[in-house]
């Protein structure tokens, strides 16, 4: 355990270093720390011995080590902090006409990436927690059709498919009837379970040959099990990490799994400093924050960047964008649920 003065010295070195990326000497600290230069140097030496500071090769100053940044995050960083200077810019950046949910999530990801210079990832509500609230089948031609699904009474998902060769018109009607009777209004998690248990038994009552029918169910509903992911600033990862991180960001489903695992049960926010179980994220910092998607649940807003990032400003921006995005989404869903002509 370090002393209060040593904690203050570490915090100040972290703050100064993340702003200038230059080693910090005792003279710079003496302007804020009410102690002699010798006392400060002695404390810096102790912090270095503990592995929280590193000595620069080109000067007598010190800089935080990865362990030092981690100590700062765990003991001094407020995860709910907000810098009012950034609020106006974020609100102004969100001043645009959104025609669908994805527009707002993509915009939020771009704003966070542009304001930090790092990589931003936004996830929609976890698929398992969404509900199937609407389903229809539209026959496009003699040989193909479109499954039109609605999640949470607001999010459309469409899947085009080739009609199985042995299907008649009544078979498409039966397919739709089974969905409406057994799957409609259920969660995506329930649908996944029923496709493996109930549906194979039900299909036998309606169809002579069931193999292609079960394959059709799997094909149509597999889209619901995928995360909706918005990545911005992927190329920025090359400035603070190696090619493995850049390539990892292409695998959006795996990215989503890793980010969800970074939050413990019940946590609303977390900061990992070189602490991810994913090898491609093991040498970077990952900030993760839940934000409200009204009427539906929580999305995930994440920032991936270097270990020596400005944590206070990064946390502030994540919080501000999360709050502004939640407000924007609230307006959007209220509009969807209102009488169009009453609104105007």
UniProtKB/Swiss-Prot annotation:
Gene Ontology terms describing biological process = negative regulation of DNA-templated transcription
Q: Is Repressor there in the keyword field?
A: yes
Signal sequence, start to end: none
* Keywords from the UniProt entry: Repressor, Stress response, Transcription, Transcription regulation
Please provide, alphabetically and separated by semicolons, the GO molecular function terms listed in this UniProt record: DNA binding
Q: Which domain of life is it from?
A: Bacteria
Would the keyword tRNA-binding turn up in this protein's UniProt record?
no
Q: Which SUPFAM superfamilies match?
A: GAF domain-like (SSF55781), Winged helix' DNA-binding domain (SSF46785)
Q: Which InterPro entries match?
A: GAF-like_dom_sf, HrcA, HrcA_C, WH-like_DNA-bd_sf, WH_DNA-bd_sf, WHTH_HrcA_DNA-bd, WHTH_transcript_rep_HrcA_IDD
Q: Which Pfam families does the protein's record reference?
A: HrcA, HrcA_DNA-bdg
Similarity-based family:
Belongs to the HrcA family.
What the protein does comes down to: Negative regulator of class I heat shock genes (grpE-dnaK-dnaJ and groELS operons). Prevents heat-shock induction of these operons.
Q: Which NCBIfam families match?
A: hrcA (TIGR00331)
> What is the protein name stated in its UniProt record?
Heat-inducible transcription repressor HrcA
Q: Which organism was this protein described from? A: Streptococcus agalactiae serotype Ia (strain ATCC 27591 / A909 / CDC SS700)
The gene for this chain is hrcA
């Amino acid at each position: 355990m370090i002393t209060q003065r040593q904690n203050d010295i570490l915090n100040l070195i972290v703050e100064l270093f993340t702003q200038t990326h230059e080693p910090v000497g005792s003279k710079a600290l003496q302007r804020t720390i009410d102690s002699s230069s010798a006392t400060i140097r002695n404390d810096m030496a102790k912090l270095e011995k503990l592995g929280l500071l590193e000595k620069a090769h080109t000067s007598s100053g010190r800089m935080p080590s990865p362990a030092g940044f981690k100590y700062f995050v765990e003991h001094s960083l407020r995860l709910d902090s907000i810098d009012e200077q950034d609020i106006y810019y974020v609100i102004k950046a969100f001043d645009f006409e959104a025609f669908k949910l994805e527009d707002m999530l993509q915009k939020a990801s771009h704003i966070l990436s542009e304001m930090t210079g790092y990589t931003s990832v936004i996830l929609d509500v976890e698929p398992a927690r969404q509900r199937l609230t609407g389903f229809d089948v539209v026959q496009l031609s003699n040989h193909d059709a479109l499954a039109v699904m609605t999640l949470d009474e607001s999010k459309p998902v469409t899947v085009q498919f080739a009609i199985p060769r042995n299907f008649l018109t009544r078979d498409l009607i039966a397919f739709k009837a089974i969905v409406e009777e057994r799957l409609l209004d259920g969660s995506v998690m329930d649908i996944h379970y029923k496709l493996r248990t109930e549906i194979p038994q039900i299909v036998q009552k309606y169809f002579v040959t069931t193999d292609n029918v079960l394959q059709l169910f799997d094909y149509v509903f597999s889209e619901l099990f995928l995360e909706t992911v918005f990545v911005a600033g992927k190329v920025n990862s090359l400035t603070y990490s190696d090619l493995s991180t850049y390539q990892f960001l292409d695998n959006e489903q795996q990215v989503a799994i890793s980010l969800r695992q970074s939050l413990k049960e019940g946590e609303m926010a977390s900061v990992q400093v070189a602490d991810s179980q994913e090898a491609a994220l093991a040498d970077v910092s990952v900030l993760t924050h839940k934000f409200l998607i009204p009427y539906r649940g929580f999305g995930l807003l994440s920032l991936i960047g270097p270990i020596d990032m400005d944590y206070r400003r990064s946390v502030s921006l994540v919080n501000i964008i999360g709050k502004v995005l939640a407000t924007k989404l609230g307006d959007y869903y209220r509009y969807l649920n209102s009488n169009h002509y009453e609104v105007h």
